[in-house]
């Protein structure tokens, strides 16, 4: 599972200006798909009660909600991609390309692993791969967060989200467990 998440995340980080995750599929779809020209959300193991309403809302707004093969949403799909429709096919192609390069193992049944242990493994994998400083607050056992400052100003864009490009990844109810990349000092000429 870690390899899949790392492959997906690496693929999006190659092409994305920013990456945000609130921990709620419905909230992400409503907020992020209205803001961007090519916004995308992909989610693993979504329950049908989390997706049913957003399927209607997104479709009525002109967006798309499909599985990783481009099949329109129906109850029981394990992985979903939501977008405002502009770059939906490109997102699907990116995910297919990234996932074809990763050897994926099929596991029968469900693997029991505490979410806290999974969060620690994921944070450590990010720390190791991207050389990002790791911070862990033990009071938050159901969350991880990656922040990384990227390039700055997007002229002519009314959205304040583009003025400081931030890469964020959040999961869970509590955002005390996090990984941050130290900011580079400003160099003067």
From Swiss-Prot:
Molecular function via GO: inositol monophosphate 1-phosphatase activity
GO biological process, one term: inositol metabolic process
Top-level taxon: Bacteria
Cysteine disulfide links: none
Cited InterPro entries: Inositol_monophosphatase-like, Mn/Fe_SOD_N_sf
Segments passing through the bilayer: none
Name of the protein: Uncharacterized 22 kDa protein in trpE 5'region
Family label: Belongs to the inositol monophosphatase superfamily.
Pfam families assigned to the protein according to its UniProt record, in alphabetical order: Inositol_P (PF00459)
